Amino acid sequence: MSCTASYAGMTTPVKDKEGHGIPCLQPIDVVECTYQYFTKSRNKLSLRVGDLIYVLTKGSNGWWDGVLIRHSANNNNNNSLILDRGWFPPSFTRSILNELHGVPDIGNELEIFQAGLNLKLELSSNPVILSLEDFLDCCRDIEFKEQLAWSPTPVHERKGCCELLYYNQDLDVYCRTLPYLPQNQVETVNDYSSFPAISKIAGKKMPITSSPDLFYLNDCDVVYWYDLTRLVCHYVNLTERDLLANEREKFLTSLDLLTAQITYVYMLFRNLRLVEDSFKKTLKKLIYTLSRFSINANIWFHSTSFEEREAIASQKDPERRSPLLQSILGTFQKFHFLLRLLHFLSNPNELTILPQLTPRFFKDSFNTISWNNPFLRTVFNQHMSMTLPRQMIKAVAGASGIVAENIDEIPASKQGTFISSETSHHSPSAPFQRRRRGTIFSNVSGSSDESDTIWSKRKKPYPLNEETLSLVRARKKQLDGKLKQMIKSANEYLSNTANFSKMLNFEMNFKTYEEVSGTIPIIDILENLDLTIFLNLRELGDENRVFDEDVAIGDEDKEFLKHSLSSLSYILSDYFNMKQYFHDVVVKFIIVAQHLTLEDPFVFSPMQNDLPTGYYEPMKPSSLNLDNAKDKKNGSQNTDIQEEEDEYEPDPDSLILFHNLINQDSDFNDLKFFNLAHVFKKSCDDYFDVLKLAIEFVNQLILERENLLNYAARMMKNNITELLLRGEEGYGSYDGGETAEKSDTNAVYADSDTKDNDEWRDSQVKLPRYLQREYDSELIWGPIVRIKGGSKHALISYLTDNEKKDLFFNITFLITFRSIFTTTEFLSYLISQYNLDPPEDLCFEEYNEWVTKKLIPVKCRVVEIMTTFFKQYWFPGYDEPDLATLNLDYFAQVAIKENITGSVELLKEVNQKFKLGNIQEATAPMKTLDQQICQDHYSGTLYSTTESILAVDPVLFATQLTILEHEIYCEITIFDCLQKIWKNKYTKSYGASPGLNEFISFANKLTNFISYSVVKEADKSKRAKLLSHFIFIAEYCRKFNNFSSMTAIISALYSSPIYRLEKTWQAVIPQTRDLLQSLNKLMDPKKNFINYRNELKSLHSAPCVPFFGVYLSDLTFTDSGNPDYLVLEHGLKGVHDEKKYINFNKRSRLVDILQEIIYFKKTHYDFTKDRTVIECISNSLENIPHIEKQYQLSLIIEPKPRKKVVPNSNSNNKSQEKSRDDQTDEGKTSTKKDRFPKFQLHKTKKKAPKVSK
């Protein structure tokens, strides 16, 4: 049954484009047809595979009431979309309501129908008029479901006569005589297709449908029935027009394209299992009619001259045309009608997704380039092949008749034999050990288990740093000399072709291959650059990111990351385009060099396809009109590269050959005749330029990486730094200066002698066996007499050693013990060490000596360590419920009874920590009196105006700012730092880091205050004064060694709202801008803030407020980038010890950094405190608008900047400073196109020479 939108079941109103309310269908479910179901009943729906049915009612009898949205074949009907509603069996369908990602938007399709969208199918440019014989011939043996209705229509002819034609609205055809088709007999047998439990094709193979998430689709791909029908009709009309226009070449092209579309239609009906006799017969007649039309049209074009055809075709009266042309047009009329008939019989659901007609790559299964692209990698299911996506396997399995639920049971060997790029990076397979022939440009895709690409053979990627850039530059420098010599040889050939022998051509060819071989290291670097930081940046912008849930990213940080990703996307896109361009240039270089050895450089030209790429590809809907058809046939839609003009004289030999071909009337196929030496020189120039381009992009990526880390470090966002660098090669390396171990690794060879304390070792050998340490063999020593690692027992034994007291080891252990033990476990080890058991087989004298020289000293050391731990290193977060089981007070009382030194003090500390309570109050840092005064006696005085800020002397402002920030810095504890980097890694008892968080918050508030003070000022001259004023304050902060405030001010002046103020920066004198440049250079993040670190080392006993972002980065890198345990290898490679050895060297490095932090808290400033200024500073930093609001104010005071006046000429802060007024997309597109031209060997040469008669 059919009904229009106004009579369908309506529940929810929607509005059309004009705002009028329209009733809308509200389906309760959406199902997709999985098996065909045909019926002749008028109250039931016939279903085809892929049809979408909107369910309105689910009947209790097993039948469902549903709706299909279809297109009407009637071109005169305004409502070309109609509803087919009826009952259907649900067993032939499956619900897809929860799989909206793979089907069209339901609401959108229904709204399109309800709004009455008129999608007209231009099935013909002229009405189709058939004779009775032709109509009956076309419709013979065709079974119509209903009797065709004909309407008499009078038609006025030019002679004044009136002819009566009969018109059928469904088929959109006129017939000169009223046709009569006998009605089909009603079958009395049961309709087996009406039973839902039976399907004609159940269990057979199914076609792969072109779901949007399966293939890399072209925008012009045919997805729905309507698109295909419209495409076929377009070529039908185009072919007829070219025939009547007497354009032979265009007609043959149009006919070729029409034949291809009819082939697609045939493939489509076959894949959709439309096996009814009516479809088969109509398709056969359609193809037969097209063949007759093609033969007769070719006879027409070859039997008469152009002038005769022009005269006949120009006749407006059809009766005066030749019989052959009338026969051709009559045949084409039948073709038009058969196409209408096919469309009428199929009556398809316009929402049905068609099988993929043109070849396309599966998503995530092919990189589409010869290079490694880490942004295309996908994490797959562990049961699946590492390179075959699940959607692809499901589709192929479904097409092979495998049930989708059994996909996971398919063996991995049958799912694919590809090697993951990530796996091959770190685990090269055995076949890589063998030599094999291949090319560096071989593609990643393939069925082989071995990959020919260089990137798959390298274990570690190249880091984005200056060292990698130096490698590229050094290799390019080696190639430049050879390349210049080759260019010189080409120039000599151009100047004197007579003396240039064939041997020299071979020599140039040999040098080309030698040059390309020298390029392999550059290709290796480009292929294996470590882009982890940019991958992490993309993941940070993803809502479903896989990072730790406890890492919080603020709104301001999200805005920055989003802006950085947007800015970097163009750079990364250009980088990959450059890689592909590099590939094209090298390939072209090799081909041109091979041409030098050929006598006829055009010997391979016949191998080239005459048709342009994408010739048979479908067209865009906007191009489906007869006016734009010419562009398609000429191939202009597929060629977007303009031919370049070469600046050289035509080769005389080429001119002679060209003239001879013209005189002999030979087909030269528009080949461009060019000078090979000039082409070779041009290829050398392109090769030279692309090498420079590679260096430029590597340098750009290095700068962008440093910019990201610079922002995170300056704003002390160590969580962002950790997330950005996670997984990067070498992440976590810490340069601790003289105390750090050089060339340190996490792999230790147990058979090598790493102990560097010979005297102590000799003294241990001389001791009796019962006095020697039991676990000494399980200690690993570093080269500077430091413990590098060891087992838990060995570390505890060394901590309580009775002969040697390693003060640094003890401090490091007590600070970082929580990363090795739980508190209960640590104290249990100490109690066990206190209660040492004597060695076996000791005599009475040996036992007394063991008690005197080892047991009692060890007990004293245990009590001393415990007392020191509770007194100096105890943190409330260390408290655990299981500690009560240790009975520490009883242990201390036992030690008192045994007269162990320090046991009384130990009992006092235990009682204070666990019995008296007030743990938090006893250990919490106390705020200074001045800070309490500032909070208790709040003053409303603020630096809220430009005048009030400028009125404060820069020296006074810097002095008071230094006093205030140093007081906050002194409140930072080592536990604040450990909490910041460990978070909940070892225990969930850690809370916030109050001291450190307050220090970071103060610095960030100061940055926002500086930037907001500038952008809120409307007067340009006052803004310039404010900039100068803050620069002077930053300079005085540097003189006072207040690097924290200095960095906060610099970060504000280089932020986006301030940095883009072109006119304001112009008003600042150059000397002041140079001063800012010198300050910024001091905080340059290159080489891990090497300038700042050297400045910090030069300070000895002077007071200082260090920039804490560097410490946070060092702590984060050291903790996250080094493993907790060492890998112990024996002399034989590959033999690993199963014991876990604690990486104590990692803890030592952390303590080195903590000691430097504590060092600057010891020396205080001798400045006079001005409470008024301090109160004003503290109060002014509150309630500052967000950075986004500041940027809007910046756009108001200086809209549309054209050119930036940069206070610093370098680009250290490019990502942070970059204005959001990016270039237009058109500008970027044109630049990219000019920079990376497509590789075309013979189409980028000079035009064919002009021939003069």
From Swiss-Prot:
<dbReference type="InterPro" id="IPR001452">
    <property type="entry name" value="SH3_domain"/>
</dbReference>
<dbReference type="InterPro" id="IPR023578">
    <property type="entry name" value="Ras_GEF_dom_sf"/>
</dbReference>
<comment type="function">
    <text>Promotes the exchange of Ras-bound GDP by GTP.</text>
</comment>
<feature type="compositionally biased region" description="Basic residues">
    <location>
        <begin position="1240"/>
        <end position="1253"/>
    </location>
</feature>
<dbReference type="Pfam" id="PF00618">
    <property type="entry name" value="RasGEF_N"/>
</dbReference>
<keyword id="KW-0132">Cell division</keyword>
<feature type="region of interest" description="Disordered">
    <location>
        <begin position="624"/>
        <end position="649"/>
    </location>
</feature>
<feature type="domain" description="N-terminal Ras-GEF">
    <location>
        <begin position="782"/>
        <end position="914"/>
    </location>
</feature>
<dbReference type="InterPro" id="IPR000651">
    <property type="entry name" value="Ras-like_Gua-exchang_fac_N"/>
</dbReference>
<dbReference type="GO" id="GO:0005085">
    <property type="term" value="F:guanyl-nucleotide exchange factor activity"/>
</dbReference>
<dbReference type="InterPro" id="IPR019804">
    <property type="entry name" value="Ras_G-nucl-exch_fac_CS"/>
</dbReference>
<keyword id="KW-0131">Cell cycle</keyword>
<dbReference type="GO" id="GO:0051301">
    <property type="term" value="P:cell division"/>
</dbReference>
<keyword id="KW-0728">SH3 domain</keyword>
<protein>
    <recommendedName>
        <fullName>Guanine nucleotide exchange factor SDC25</fullName>
    </recommendedName>
</protein>
<dbReference type="InterPro" id="IPR008937">
    <property type="entry name" value="Ras-like_GEF"/>
</dbReference>
<keyword id="KW-0344">Guanine-nucleotide releasing factor</keyword>
<feature type="domain" description="SH3">
    <location>
        <begin position="26"/>
        <end position="98"/>
    </location>
</feature>
<dbReference type="GO" id="GO:0007265">
    <property type="term" value="P:Ras protein signal transduction"/>
</dbReference>
<feature type="domain" description="Ras-GEF">
    <location>
        <begin position="952"/>
        <end position="1199"/>
    </location>
</feature>
<dbReference type="InterPro" id="IPR001895">
    <property type="entry name" value="RASGEF_cat_dom"/>
</dbReference>
<dbReference type="GO" id="GO:0005886">
    <property type="term" value="C:plasma membrane"/>
</dbReference>
<dbReference type="InterPro" id="IPR036028">
    <property type="entry name" value="SH3-like_dom_sf"/>
</dbReference>
<feature type="region of interest" description="Disordered">
    <location>
        <begin position="1202"/>
        <end position="1253"/>
    </location>
</feature>
<dbReference type="Pfam" id="PF00617">
    <property type="entry name" value="RasGEF"/>
</dbReference>
<feature type="compositionally biased region" description="Basic and acidic residues">
    <location>
        <begin position="1215"/>
        <end position="1237"/>
    </location>
</feature>
<dbReference type="InterPro" id="IPR036964">
    <property type="entry name" value="RASGEF_cat_dom_sf"/>
</dbReference>
